[in-house]
A protein has these predicted regions:
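Structural preference for beta-strand elements that scaffold enzyme active sites
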Residues: 95, 131-133
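Basic/polar N-terminal segments that are highly enriched at the extreme N-terminus
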Residues: 1-7
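Conserved active-site tyrosine of GNAT-family acetyltransferases
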Residues: 149, 154
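Short acidic/polar active-site loop segments enriched in Thr and Asp
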Residues: 130, 155
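Acetyl-CoA-dependent GNAT
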Residues: 8, 12-99, 104, 117-118, ...
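Conserved beta-strand-loop-alpha-helix junction that forms the acyl-donor binding cleft
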Residues: 108, 133-145, 163-167
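Conserved residues at the C-terminal ends of beta-strands
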Residues: 88, 135, 160
Length: 171
């Protein structure tokens, strides 16, 4: 674990940061996906991640960084990328959304995630939004994220998502 100095700054993402941002996110989520895999039906996990979670996440996140770089902010600690956040604005709902947030494992539990969340919320406020949303999964691997969001004042909206394997004959 790296010690967080007083030199935390959050800056706009630049294309030169792309590979670092992708690598950081994969490191951040490496402990999460094995726990998620155990918690969801195999046919669902395999449909979402047929080539492994790293391949899918890398592709999805690369698309975010390439298609909407203006929505991404990066946390630097002493010049080292410690995390990043993508904030989407949904004016039709007067809502900002933390679409992606990732903190390098070396910088977790040092306030980086909280700082990125606050920065994202300020982006939404500056855009005139009146509420903020973040989504995560209910599996054990995402428990730390849920705790952080709840500690930050986010209230859970009970949502249920169901999947059915259509390759199996009906009962």
């Amino acid at each position: 674990m790296k010690s967080m100095s007083n030199h935390l700054c959050i800056i706009r993402y630049e294309e030169s940061m792309r590979q670092n941002a992708l690598d950081l996110a994969l490191r951040a989520w490496a402990p999460v996906f094995p726990q998620m895999k155990e918690a969801v039906p195999g046919f669902v996990y395999n449909a979402f991640y047929p080539d492994g979670w790293q391949t899918r996440q890398n592709s999805d996140l690369a698309q975010v960084l390439d298609d909407e770089p203006e929505t991404v902010d990066v946390a630097l600690v002493d010049g080292v990328m410690a995390g990043w956040v993508c904030t989407r604005i949904h004016p039709e709902d007067s809502m900002g959304e933390v679409y992606v947030i990732a903190v390098d494992p070396d910088f977790q539990r040092q306030g980086i995630g909280r700082a990125l969340m606050e920065h994202s919320q300020n982006r939404a406020l500056d855009a005139g939004m009146t509420m903020m949303m973040v989504e995560t999964s209910d599996d054990p691997g995402h428990a730390p994220a849920r705790a952080a969001y709840e500690a930050g004042g986010y209230q859970r909206w009970p949502v249920a998502r169901y999947f059915k394997d259509l390759r199996r004959p009906p009962i």
